[in-house]
Every structure is written in C-alpha cells, then in structure tokens.
C-alpha cells in the first residue's frame, strides 16, 4: 500500500487524511467550530492545512461537513457525487437554529462533481490513490464510502459490520455486502474504533 492513512480527531468525529504519492484527500470534517482542531491535529504530525488537496464528505450531517466551506476557501477542492447533491444543505437549518455563527453553507458551484464510477480514475490521476468511492446508504441515503485497493474502507457512520443484523435494515446489509465484495477487511469509522473483518 502506498497510501498513508492519518486519523485526525475533530471533536467527536474522526476524520482521515489519506495521502497518496501525488496528493491528499481529507475524509469528513468536524462541526463548524473545528477548523482550529483540524489544524492542531495536522500540526501534531508536522503538517498544516495546505497538505489537504481534496475533501470527501461521507454524508451531510453537521458533524461531518461543518468546515467544508472554510476548507474550500483555503484552496481545498470539495468532491461532490450527484447522489449527495440533494442533501448538501440538509444540516444548514440545524446550524441556523442553534445561532451558530461559525457555520457557512457550502456553495455547490464551488464543488467538483465526482461520480463514483469515475472516482478510481480521478483519485489515481490527482492523488496517486488506488481506490474508489462507492454509495453505501444505510445510516443516511447520501452515505458514501472510500474503498482502497489495500482493503481499507472509510465508511463514516455506517454501523459496524458485527451490528448489521441488530438493525434489520436491508439497505445497510446491501451496503456491507457491496463493501465485502470489494475486498474490504479494515474499516475506519467516524465514531467507532477500527474494525477488522
């Protein structure tokens, strides 16, 4: 595996920096106030925010996309699959309701559209990352995962594999079957410890 994986804790959300030979991809952000936390986490690894080339949000809940626009304004490219477009502004009302002045809504026109079927070619060309984006609904209808050829998968808030049967959710089961079919054996969650399958 030539990708380096770095977990970064932003509040209660674990974000991941996946570094390829030619570029890097941040998976998820924390809440709107977490830009400083992200910067501090990177600094602990002798890095800064300029290391981040692309951002992929596993699903549009407030604790996964809160600083997306801040990062875009710092030069990071937000990758946005069409399956997520209807959900981009879903968390906005929560920030407005809570009078959160740190939050700024995403501007869709600032995002780079990236369809899952094109993701392998894009990630290879722009980051040197061998992997692909796949739709994995279950936790939310807009959930996506990044699956690396190494067998690592970044699944956001998809429930752990060993709990799938507790939910009795066919969509969640189907998403896990898709991940297993792609050879996933090490799962990185946003709120759970890693799970080896």
List PLM regions with ranges.
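Metallo-beta-lactamase
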Residues: 32-33, 126-197
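Residue-level marker for buried hydrophobic side chains located in beta-strands
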Residues: 25-27, 56, 78, 152-154, ...
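Short gly/ser/thr-rich secondary-structure transition/capping motifs
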Residues: 8-9, 39, 110-118, 135-137, ...
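Short acidic-hydrophobic surface loop/beta-edge motif
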Residues: 8, 18, 119-128
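Active-site HxH/HxHxD metal-binding segment of metal-dependent hydrolases
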Residues: 33-35, 43-121
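A general structural detector for well-ordered alpha-helical segments in enzyme core domains, enriched
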Residues: 38-41, 67, 172-178
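Conserved beta-strand hairpin/beta-sheet module of binuclear metal-dependent hydrolase folds
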Residues: 1-45, 145-158
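A structural micro-motif
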Residues: 3, 50, 76, 129-131, ...
